[in-house]
Amino acid sequence: MARLLIYDAYENKVYTYANLNENNPMPYSTGTTLRVREFRGKSASPTLWTTIAAMEAWTLTRRKYGKGIPVGYAFRRIWEGGHGTRSQHYAGVSFDVGQSLTRTARTAIYNAARGTGAWGYVEPLSQTPTWVHMDRRYGTPACSGTTAGYPTLRRGSRGCYVMILQDALSTLGYQTGSRIDGIFGARTEEALKGFQRRTSLRVDGVCGCNSWKKISTAVIGVGRTKTTID
C-alpha cells in the first residue's frame, strides 16, 4: 500500500491519496497505462509523490505512441540515490523508459514524447543509447546557467521540490514535521535554518543554489535514517 501526494501547479495545492494498492492506476493517468508499482519501481518508500502535469504528459505520450511503455525508473527518494544530486526522479516527475525495447521502438517513444510538447525535457537519444528519458520539471532552477536542478524555495512554497527538501532535511536530522506534506511552513523553515547554521551558509530560511548543493550532497544515497519521515 502506498500514500501518494500529487501537486497541482494549476491550483498550487497538494492532494493526498491514502492506501493505494500497488496495482492501482496512478491518478490522472489514462486507464491502467501506469500502475503504482510501475511508478514506484525499486523504491521501498511508503510515500510517493508526483505532479498532475507529469501524469498528463505521460498520458499524452502513451496515447501518441499507441502501445505499452515499459518503465525502468521513475520515482526515487533522494536518500535512496541512484541518480544525480539534482535528479528530477527525486521529485517524481521523471521517467526512464524502454530499456527492454528495440532501438526503433525507443525512437518512436522519443518522437511521441517530443511531439506532445508536454514534457519539460526529453533527453536526446545520443545521450541515452538504451533508454528514453523524459521529465516534467517545473520552476526556474536556483543555480544560474543551467536548465537542471531545483527552484528556490521559501516559506509559502508548495510542491514536489518542497517534498524533496523535507525528505532530505528530516533524513539529515532536521525535523520539518511528522510527515512529508509538500508545504513549506514554519517547521520546514526552522529546519532549513538549522542546517544552514551548522554548515556555515547564510541563515535566511531560503533554499537557494548553495543550500541545495550542500543538502543534496549531504543526503544523496545515505539510506533511511532514524529521523527520516514519510
Q: What is each stretch, according to the model?
A:
Residues L4-Y7, T85-V93, Q99-L172, S178, ...:
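Catalytic cores and adjacent binding grooves of peptidoglycan-active enzymes
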Residues F39-S43, P151, G177:
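A short, mixed-charge helix-start or loop-turn motif at secondary-structure junctions
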Residues R3-T128, V132-R136:
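Cell-envelope/glycan interface and biosynthesis
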Residues I220-D230:
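C-terminal extensions
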